[in-house]
Amino acid sequence: YELHDVYRALSVLASEMDFIQSEVYKNSFFLGNRNDRILYYDCTNYYFEIEQEDGDKRYGKSKEHRPNPIIQMGLFTDGDGIPLAFSLFPGNQNEQKSLKPLETKILQQFGCEKFIYCSDAGLASEDNRVLNHMGQRAFIVTQSIKKLPAEDRAWALNKTDFKRLSDDKVVDITNLTENDKEQLFYKDEPFTTKKLHQRLIITYSPKYAAYQKAIRAEQISRAEKMVANGTLKKQRKNPNDPARFVN
């Protein structure tokens, strides 16, 4: 095959995209089992070096902070990180709305009906949670502590009543020792919103906490240098910008 053969095949691949994906999934079982009881979903986008919108190539929030029109892609992977299905949608569309059409295809065309949906907070809207509270599906998604009601936020940040995952022993995470460095701690409680009865799970990892502490220390050091050198930016576009530590 030569390059022009690949180009000629693109239109066929595009028109048969859904069928090809479902058949690849079904035939993959001939090579081994798929960990399809846990599905991860995320979105990204791709920019085009053009100066005007064209079709689904629309101006939107580029992951690479480019000022060009973009196409967005939603991707499901299985529990082992192997791609399952994807969809493309306009660059100016809210990515929250991309889940339902693709998940519907998985349910109808793939025959994959029993799974746990996992995503970050950006794709964990109330509607997406409701969608995955139906049938044989469930969900585990990230929840911003800052956006919790005051009572739940206070409970989440309270350092008492955690349990050690390895033995369920109740601990106060302010009294951890060096031996607990590799341990994981959690606590949970009922969490009810307008549409759903859920459970809110808070986890704490001493190892990850130390990692985040080191990152903050480095960012504070950079912020101090910015102040000293007079290079402090007035606008803070990135939540990880060191300048956020300076009032």
Residue ranges of model-derived segments:
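Anion-binding and metal-coordination hotspots
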Residues: 1-247
